């Protein structure tokens, strides 16, 4: 499938900038807080790891073109500052475009509704790009992410993968 190019997405307080390798230095301090990894696993990345990861993620699609990879850096509008990231992996399933979405906001900026605003903006853009179904995998103890998903119209299902509950909009 020929996927459209990722675009910049703007909302009232945040801008979603399409991810590039050049974002790595700016994202390093955003991802440095170990508490980010409490529910998602892993450890804070090094600059070299971010360069490699962003090199792959910014390609925009899988080698076989079956998946559309969308990654944005979430930035405050004023002052312009990176505070997190948004992700969507889109693929066709049973004739429907399904986006597996995820979000991370630096703990220093959590509790302000930024993830909710950024996620809503991403979903509007994805819907305009033809996506029909949204799913997110959320740790059952991660109340903040569950609240964000619920505000986007996602509901928990009985499906559990790797200890995370599948949420979806249908």
Spans of features found by a protein language model:
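Internal amphipathic alpha-helical segments of the cytochrome P450 catalytic fold
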Residues: 37, 111, 145-146
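Primarily hydrophobic membrane-targeting regions of prokaryotic envelope proteins
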Residues: 111-114, 119
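GNAT-family acyltransferases
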Residues: 1-108, 121, 125, 129, ...
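Conserved G/P- and acidic residue-centered "switch" motifs that form tight phosphate/ATP-binding loops
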Residues: 80, 113, 142
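Conserved active-site alpha-helix within GNAT-family acetyltransferase domains
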Residues: 116, 141-157
């Amino acid at each position: 499938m020929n996927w459209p190019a990722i675009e910049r997405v703007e909302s009232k307080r945040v801008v979603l900038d399409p991810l590039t390798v050049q974002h790595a230095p700016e994202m390093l301090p955003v991802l440095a807080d170990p508490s980010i990894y409490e529910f998602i696993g892993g450890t804070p990345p090094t600059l070299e790891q971010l360069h490699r990861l962003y090199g792959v993620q910014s390609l925009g699609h899988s080698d076989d073109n079956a998946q559309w990879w969308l990654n944005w850096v979430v930035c405050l509008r004023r002052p312009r500052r990176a505070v997190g990231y948004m992700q969507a992996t889109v693929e066709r399933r049973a004739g429907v475009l399904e986006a597996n979405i995820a979000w991370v906001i630096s703990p220093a900026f959590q509790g302000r509704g930024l993830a909710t605003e950024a996620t809503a903006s991403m979903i509007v853009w994805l819907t305009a790009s033809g996506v029909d179904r949204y799913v997110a995998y959320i740790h059952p103890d991660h109340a903040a992410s569950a609240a964000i998903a619920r505000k986007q119209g996602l509901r928990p299902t009985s499906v559990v993968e790797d200890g995370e509950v599948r949420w979806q909009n249908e």
